[in-house]
Amino acid sequence: MESTFSSPAEAALQREAGVPGQFTPPEDLDRVYELERVTRFICDLGCQRVALQFPDQLLGDAGAVAARLEEVTGSKMFILGDTAYGSCCVDVLGAEQAGAQALVHFGPACLSPPASLLPITFVLGRRPVALELCAKAFEAQNPDPTALVVLLSEPACAHALEPLATLLRPKYQDLLISSPALPLPVGSLSSQPESLERFGRRFPLNPGRSLEEYGAFYVGASQASSDPNLDPDLSRLLLGWTPGRPFFSCCPDTGQTQDQGAKAGRLRARRLYLVERARDARVVGLLVGTLGVAQHLEALAHLRKLTEAAGKRSYVLALGKPTPAKLANFPEMDVFVLLACPLGALTLQPSGGFFRPILTPCELEAACNPAWPPPGLAPHLTHYAELLPGSPFHVPLPPPESELWDTPDVSLISGELRPPPPWKSSDDTKCSALTPRPQLELAESSPAASFLSSRSWQGLEPRLGQTPVKEAVQGRRGIAIAYEDEGSS
């Protein structure tokens, strides 16, 4: 049945969901998915049940990969797809529900520390890279052989950084090569104990050097992309990189480069705008965007403490993957804060399709903590773990008697003066003897009550005792699209 207000019932069966899947030729499965290394990982652990996690675009190969691994290892494989949150995070909950003893993650990964001690290995992929073209592009953008530059890449191009560095090292002696911060095998020691770990990567810095001194050359961004928004991995790097240092991206297929300085400036400007929106907000929705990343419960408690200290009301919402339709059910919220891994938190920005802006935890920290940022710290963090106690970037809330809470604050959006937190008493104890007793006109100020009073429809009227009592009668039968008492059209 089809009408002006509904689609035909057959449309739900004919609709193609998700993105087109990838089908790799059988002879290339071993190379693309590194099955030899995965087999060695499973056999060394002696696992009998293994979970294989695939993103949507790789589910077409999931069956063939699982069958090949079962044949070689003799272990039982479980395919994990359609994760409740971002596919870049390991689905440790799904693996534990399947009784898996280990997990293999295929595809792009944020490499955030998991909340479980389950053995995990990552297969990031091996995207082809034109080394000669990328080397020429690097030399064109860095004519000074003494320049401090670090080589970065998207996860699928990480395998090409060492060969690229081999071509460049005869000329560039101070070249720094990053590597994915993959978990080390159980019982092994890192060969680079002094390496700095940041942005999901390891940087083997020389003594006396800091990452803030280096420019960046990123292999992986493509100028042929039709999406005007930056991918989350590159956005994460641009936000956290030192302002003023050169940052170039290079397409691994063509070797074409692009200066990302202007895009980094737009990202930081958008972050400042979101901070202002968070400062103006009275009701904040905390969206749970991960259950598999370490310290997510501590981060949730930290965000609730922040909003309470700033005099804001917060609500925790566990909705799975956020969509405009889901969040539209909560019009009381002024802003939403997505508690997720760095890539998941940046995936929804810019949040043009949502009726309220979606922030990252770092933006809420900058809005609610008057002591943020401390001198010498750039406020462009991307991971919520960097805000928690124990992190070198943690900034505790100032005490209630601190003058930071009394600093005049004017909204850059509305131009109005923001009031201090409600718990901050404005009464002067020296003049309390002359203060008249209040008449209790306002018992309590509630953002929810203010929002309800401003709505044109406030719900059904109870009208207790005013409605006549009637006997129950049989109602309509059927579904909303076609009740039984309606004729077919």
Curated annotation (Swiss-Prot):
Residue numbers of N-acetylmethionine PTMs: M1
Q: Which residues carry this modification: Phosphothreonine?
A: T435, T467
Question: Where in the sequence is Phosphoserine found?
Answer: S7, S446, S456, S488
The record's annotation in Gene3D superfamilies points to:
Diphthamide synthesis DPH1/DPH2 domain 1, Diphthamide synthesis DPH1/DPH2 domain 3
Q: Which residues bind [4Fe-4S] cluster?
A: C89, C110, C341
Q: Which GO terms describe its biological process?
A: protein histidyl modification to diphthamide
Cofactor or coenzyme needed:
[4Fe-4S] cluster
Instruction: Give the multimer and partner information.
Output: Component of the 2-(3-amino-3-carboxypropyl)histidine synthase complex composed of DPH1, DPH2, DPH3 and a NADH-dependent reductase. Interacts with DPH1.
Any idea what this protein is called?
A: 2-(3-amino-3-carboxypropyl)histidine synthase subunit 2
The species is Rattus norvegicus
